[in-house]
Amino acid sequence: AGGAHFFGQEGSRKVPEKGKEPATRSVLMAPTLHKAHQAAGRQTDDSAVVHFFKNMMSPKAPVQQKARSGASRAITKFIWGTDGQRPHYGASGSSKSREAYRGRKDGSGTLSSFFKMGKKGEGSPARR
């Protein structure tokens, strides 16, 4: 259970759903959120986000084991620095629209290249 691989998949596979607002919220999250907001809306959505971050930032740090060069650090910086710090309460408002276009552009292109670069340890140029 790592972080890097599902970033790639949800980045590119969830792009077609960018038009729907509930789907937009799950674009930068995991498929778990997709099921969550269907089942119980905001409530489960929130806990799924929390679970996602607990899993991501746990002391075991599955991400670091998977990509132990610069990627884990870059991933963390990317998540918390960009949209990760306000996915569950920002998605309803401002972050919704920008996630829509982020999903379209960054989904396949920048996001994947970001991880290729991040593994080499060049996280910052990819973030811009």
From Swiss-Prot:
Residues 11-23, 96-107 have a biased composition (Basic and acidic residues). It is found in: Myelin membrane. GO terms for molecular function: structural constituent of myelin sheath. It comes from the Eukaryota. Keywords: Cell membrane, Membrane. The keyword Cell membrane applies. One of its GO terms (cellular component) is myelin sheath. Its main location: membrane. Pfam families: Myelin_MBP. The keyword Cell membrane applies. PROSITE patterns: MYELIN_MBP. It is a peripheral membrane protein. The N-terminus is blocked. Residues 1-24, 82-128 are annotated as: Disordered. This protein may function to maintain proper structure of myelin. Belongs to the myelin basic protein family. This is Myelin basic protein. It comes from Carcharhinus obscurus. The gene is MBP.
